[in-house]
Amino acid sequence: AARLAAFLPAALHVGFPLTVRELVSLGRTCHLAGVFESARDRESVASAMEFSGVAQFADRRYTELSAGEQRRVLIARALAQESRLLLLDEPAANLDASQAVRMLDGLASMARRDGVSIVAAMHDLNLALLVCDRVMLLNQGAVVGFGTPEEVMRYQALKDVFRCDFYVGRNELNGRLFVVPMKSPE
């Protein structure tokens, strides 16, 4: 199963003083033939750390990193697994705006290039609209809409789910939808 799907948890408590490289290497566990890492395992770990921008932290302890750096390490661990399906819980959590856009754009490009499917739970609607070609809108666990952003992210659906007004517009620079939650007029 681990070869089929990789999971990025919302948070991970690491009780051992693992280095970044050691933690990312745990993503390769499902590929190990015996106890020792292969050259392919080391290559996959290095590539995943480079993609996630954490290669410079390889020998640092995971617990010494900032929350955003830890997030990128966990993304690298999921990528090192080389699964065909990535299940990502809040992949942009604790990342600043530029890191979030770069990471999500990189993941979307990788998905298109390598045929990897990505399912991501995201609360930042605008980040989702920036990179997702399909979105699912949930209301207390029930599916309210599934389809293209244009089909799903409509004013009334957003208002019903989040119980506030929204402005739904189109970015003139990139043509993508964006949403702005608004205080209801009094």
Q: How would you describe each model-predicted region?
A:
Residues 61-65, 69:
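Conserved ABC ATPase signature
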Residues 146-147:
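ABC ATPase "signature
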Residues 25, 39-57, 82:
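Conserved ABC ATPase "signature" region
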Residues 101-114:
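Helical segment within the ABC ATPase nucleotide-binding domain
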